[in-house]
Amino acid sequence: MAGVGAGPLRAMGRQALLLLALCATGAQGLYFHIGETEKRCFIEEIPDETMVIGNYRTQMWDKQKEVFLPSTPGLGMHVEVKDPDGKVVLSRQYGSEGRFTFTSHTPGDHQICLHSNSTRMALFAGGKLRVHLDIQVGEHANNYPEIAAKDKLTELQLRARQLLDQVEQIQKEQDYQRYREERFRLTSESTNQRVLWWSIAQTVILILTGIWQMRHLKSFFEAKKLV
C-alpha cells in the first residue's frame, strides 16, 4: 500500500485500521490505495457534540497507461461511521467524489470505514483505486464565508463568531481530556485493586502450604518414630 498522510497509519489485516492522529482543532489530508471490495477504516478521536466533515475523491488505475485516471465516473464509495459503543452513526452510498458529515454524540474513538462498489464495475475488477481523503473536525469544519453570507455578518462579527467557536471547541477538548483522565483513573484503581487481592491470595496460599508441609513432616517423623 502506498499512501501519504499527516498522521501515523497502521494496517491491520485486510480490513486495515489506519490510526490517524488527527487533532480536533485541525484538518488532515492523505491518500491511500485499496483493492477490489477492500475496506479501509480509520480511527478518529472526537469529543462529544462535535461536527466532522470528510471530503474524498477517487482515482482509478489505468492498467494500459499505467496511470491513475483523473476521475472515475460510475464508481461509488460507501461510507460507514461507528461511535465508541459500536453504534452506526452514518451508513450511506456516495459517488466517486463526495462529502460526508456527522456529529459525534459520544466522546472517544470513532471508526470511519470506506469501501467501493467495485464489484459492479468490470473496469476496476482486480485493480486498485486511489482515494484522497480530507477530514475536518470541530470549528474547522465550519464554512465561515457561507455563514457570513447567510447571516449577513460583518468582518468583525465573523471574526467574533470564529473566536467563540474556537473557545467552544477548546472547552469540548478539555471536557474530553477530563473524561479520559477519569476513565484512566478508574482503570488504574481497578487494576491496583486486582493486584492487591492477587497478592493477598498468594500470601494466604503460601501460608496454608507452609502449614500443610509442617504438619505433613510432623506426621512423617512421628510415623518413623524420629520425634
Swiss-Prot record:
SMART domains named among the record's database cross-references: EMP24_GP25L
Entry keyword Signal: yes
Glycosylation sites: N117
Sequence motif COPII vesicle coat-binding, location on chain: 220-221
Coiled-coil annotated spans: 147-176
InterPro entries to which the protein is assigned, alphabetical: Emp24-like, GOLD_dom
Ranges for domain GOLD: 39-137
Motif window: COPI vesicle coat-binding: 220-227
Residue ranges crossing the lipid bilayer per the database entry: 195-212
Bilayer topology: Single-pass type I membrane protein
GO cellular component, one term: endoplasmic reticulum membrane
Pfam families xref list: EMP24_GP25L
Signal peptide (UniProt feature, chain positions): 1-29
Alphabetical keyword list: Coiled coil, Endoplasmic reticulum, Glycoprotein, Membrane, Protein transport, Signal, Transmembrane, Transmembrane helix, Transport
GO process terms (BP): endoplasmic reticulum to Golgi vesicle-mediated transport; Golgi organization; intracellular protein transport; positive regulation of canonical NF-kappaB signal transduction
Compartments in which it is found: Endoplasmic reticulum membrane
Topological domain ranges for the Lumenal compartment: 30-194
Cytoplasmic side: 213-227
PANTHER family tied to this protein: TRANSMEMBRANE EMP24 DOMAIN-CONTAINING PROTEIN
Biological role: Involved in vesicular protein trafficking, mainly in the early secretory pathway. targeting. Involved in the maintenance of the Golgi apparatus. Appears to play a role in the biosynthesis of secreted cargo including processing. Involved in endoplasmic reticulum stress response. May play a role in the regulation of heat-shock response and apoptosis.
Family: Belongs to the EMP24/GP25L family.
Protein known as: Transmembrane emp24 domain-containing protein 4
Species name: Homo sapiens
